[in-house]
A protein has these predicted regions:
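Amphipathic, Lys/Arg-enriched alpha-helical "gate/interface" segment within cytosolic domains
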Residues: 1-168
């Protein structure tokens, strides 16, 4: 299910998997980042999200002020959420955000009770989060239909990942 309640984010939720996919959708405009991040936290709580993918590749460089806010206001609440697993998608060339995220996680590590994994692309991260669920191709198709310039034939919906195990 595509969620449109937070305009700064592209959001997709699958209730049976307890999986929320999150991507920044406002380009370089970070003026409403804090408000949207706070709304995201409320959504995670409201839905009882267990597995979340945050695509950090779509987020501009996080300012020092936003990093401090996240570390003091946002991370402590996220650490108390229902999350069991978190995937952070970040390309190795996104050094600024990689360092910012590493710093935030290090500071909040004593509070965090969920598994955190890094992936360079969303596909493998979604496979891991969903335990290679048979629901994943439909979720990928739904996402591609919304985000792909060629929505008629979503390429990744029918492709099997090298990590895919049939029957799960």
């Amino acid at each position: 299910m595509i969620i449109t309640s937070i305009p700064d984010f592209s959001l997709q939720y699958d209730e049976p998997l307890g999986l929320l996919r999150v991507e920044w959708a406002s380009g370089d405009d970070m003026r409403t980042f804090r408000d949207s991040a706070a709304k995201l936290l409320l959504l995670v709580r409201e839905l009882g999200v267990r597995h979340m993918l945050l695509n950090m590749n779509t987020l501009p460089d996080i300012s020092v002020y936003d990093q401090v806010w996240m570390g003091t206001r946002w991370m402590p609440h996220m650490a108390k959420s229902s999350l069991e697993r978190l995937v952070l998608v970040i390309h190795r060339r996104r050094v600024h955000n990689q360092l910012a995220i590493d710093s935030l996680i290090a500071a909040a590590r004593p509070l965090i009770h969920f598994d955190i994994q890094y992936f360079p692309q969303p596909g493998p991260g979604l496979h891991w989060l969903s335990d290679y669920s048979v629901r994943l191709p439909a979720l990928l198709a739904e996402w591609e239909a919304l985000h792909s310039p060629n929505a008629a034939t979503p390429p990744s919906a029918n492709e099997r990942s090298p990590f895919y195990r049939a029957g799960h």
